[in-house]
Amino acid sequence: MKYCKFIILLLFCALLMNFQCDNDDVRQTDSCDGPVLVDNTTYQMSESSFYIVITAIIEDDCLNVNISSSGCDGSIWDLALRDSEDIAESMPPQRYLKLILVNNEDCLAVFNKEQSFDLSELRIDGVNQVILNIEDFPEALRYSY
């Protein structure tokens, strides 16, 4: 009887160990609208239409930006995020980004556009956060991962 209780206790412990979660560390990258292009040549050569960044907020692995620009309705605007590939050797490290807006609308009305970008390509091995400096945005953003 003593061995029976011991075996039941061992089986119960083994059963409890099976209830651990296997998928809690899976990143959700589907929620961002687009990627960041990490390319210094594109960063240097890209020209943008005029815009104003209203907000830039990091949530999980997504940078959510809200911009304002003139146009007819903003439906054909193309907004992209470029990284310079330059990494400032500070602690935490810093990266330099640029938003590129292609706006071929010739109207004088002002519209806003929201878009998100997947920041996971900007991670740096050996650290768990990076400071992001977006051109023409006054605040540096801290991306923790």
Describe each region flagged by the PLM:
Residues 42-56:
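N-terminal edge beta-strand
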Residues 99-129:
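Short, solvent-exposed, Trp/other aromatic-anchored flexible loops in extracytoplasmic proteins
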Residues 14-38:
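Bacterial Sec-dependent N-terminal signal peptides
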Residues 119-145:
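Surface-exposed edge beta-strand/loop patches
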